[in-house]
Amino acid sequence: MGRTVNCIKLGRELEGLDFPPYPGELGKRIFENVSKEAWAGWIRHQTMLVNEYHLNLSDIKARKYLAEQLDAYFFGSGAEQPRGYVPLAK
């Protein structure tokens, strides 16, 4: 296991990312506070948002929306769930 971080999303000490996954200050905060496991959770959530909202990633508005959701997912009150989303029962 490489470097560890106290993961802000999962609330425990876990393996950290190998490099900042996003540019700028937000990428630095993610690198310092988010585990690989939590980042994988964001990738799944981001994929759901892109698919459900048919986001075009070449559109600046779509990229801005995803950046806002990324910040909310880790450092805010949580990212938005698509309209009508019902999580699978466990």
Curated annotation (Swiss-Prot):
GO terms for biological process: cellular response to oxidative stress. InterPro entries: Fe_traffick_prot_YggX, Fe_traffick_prot_YggX_sf. Could be a mediator in iron transactions between iron acquisition and iron-requiring processes, such as synthesis and/or repair of Fe-S clusters in biosynthetic enzymes. It holds the Pfam family Iron_traffic. Belongs to the Fe(2+)-trafficking protein family. HAMAP family: Fe_traffic_YggX. It comes from Nitrosospira multiformis (strain ATCC 25196 / NCIMB 11849 / C 71). One of its GO terms (molecular function) is iron ion binding. GO terms for cellular component: cytosol. PANTHER family: FE(2+)-TRAFFICKING PROTEIN-RELATED. This is Probable Fe(2+)-trafficking protein. Keywords: Iron. NCBIfam families: PRK05408.1.
